[in-house]
Amino acid sequence: MLKRLQMMVALGAATLPLPLSAASVPVTLTPGTAFTRIGSRDIAMLGFNGTCPGPEIRQRQNDILRARVENGLEDGTLVHWHGIRLPNAMDGVNVLTQDVIIPNEGYEYRFPVSGSRCRNLLVSLPLPFLRTGRPRTVRPLIVEEPAPPDVDQDITAILFDIRLDDTGQFDMEFDRADFITAGRLGNLMTTFLSSEQARLGDHIRLRLINPTPDRIFEIRIDGLTGFCVAYDGMPLPELVSLGNLKLAPAQRIDIIADVTGDVILRETVPSGGEELGGIMLNGQRQIRSAPIAPLPANLVPAPGEITQTADLFMQGGAGGGAHGGFGGWAFNDVSGLPNKPLISARRDEAVQVRMVNDTAFPHGIHLHGHHFWETDQNGARTHLRDTTLVAPGETMTIVCVLDNPGAWMLHCHMLSHQADGMATWMQVS
């Protein structure tokens, strides 16, 4: 059954619903059951407004986003606006920023995207998916530049990973091994695309988003000649050539490229080339002669003197040593949010966090409300990101200017790991 479904998915990726504009009118988000078509089968999922993934929201920088959430679920819920710089009260994190929206109640999120340093974002609904047996839902939020690059198409690609049972429906069984190993990985992968056709010679922008709970994707894209231009919504000062692209859960990559054939996305691990979906040729145009240029930089304060440092030890999991936490995973011998923040800083302080992965599994570590610099082995700052992937046995040091007041979560974005202990927070006053 699963092999047959995988073959049907390989014939074509699913299409995202048409985008919504939220520049002048509020958007209503209604979480509930939605049926996602994969291959020839409708699969019951959680969705926004009857679709999963929900239709993307598009805004320009300087817009005010207004989103009303009407909770018709049997559980409390929140909406977290992943990767965006926003007021702390709008971050959608239980305990730290707001109480859950109880069933049959509503809540309006309202914040400017003028200060956003991100160009492609993700809205996720952190439902109690481990209890309901259904995954959280996602909806892309695209924040466009005041003067976007001149492209023929701007295409969103949402990577998707799901575990199906023998009947081809969502597998509602959970195993302890899902929490203490690499996470709850699916047995079927695909891609939801906002467009599935392009002309030979088209100049396109492709926004790759990995919203999956636990899977790390390693992608090869056939049929494109171009460059990576942004990581996690932050423009790269120098273009990065297209090779195999690794995206941990919550990471994003922007690409600008020319179409040179059918555009096929392939997962290279472990199958070595499983087709996830594609953009098929329909017509032809002359390839542009102008070279691809980097995107305009976002305004980010450069760190001055480092005023605070902290160590974040990742502990636990299968094959890991003992730790002081109650869960399968821990940060610094604590499972779950500790009473005291990892760092308590004044606004605009530059801090450094040394992340030590003392486990047998990789972890994608995400900071809310900010971006940070990854550093190399010599301590030099490299890429601005909001999520960094730390391999087993690796130490990654990040530098961040904490210039957004509030209580901000720092956690593993392999959500099975977060649910079983990998979470802490920072306080900015």
Where are the predicted features?
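N-terminal edge beta-strand
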Residues: G39-Q61, R184-E196, G321-R347
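Short, hydrophobic/aromatic beta-strand segments
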Residues: D75-H82, R215-D222, H363-L367
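Extracytoplasmic beta-sandwich strand-turn segments characteristic of Greek-key/jelly-roll folds
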Residues: C52, E56-Q59, W81-S116, T191-E196, ...
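Extended terminal and domain-junction accessory segments
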Residues: S24-T30, R131-D165, P237-P362, V401-A407, ...
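Structural beta-strand segments of beta-rich domains
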Residues: D63-L65, D202-L206, E349-V351
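Acidic-aromatic/histidine active-site loop/patch
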Residues: Q153-D202, I209-P213, G324-V334
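Asparagine-centered strand-capping/turn motif at beta-strand->loop junctions
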Residues: V69-L73, L208-P211, M355-T359
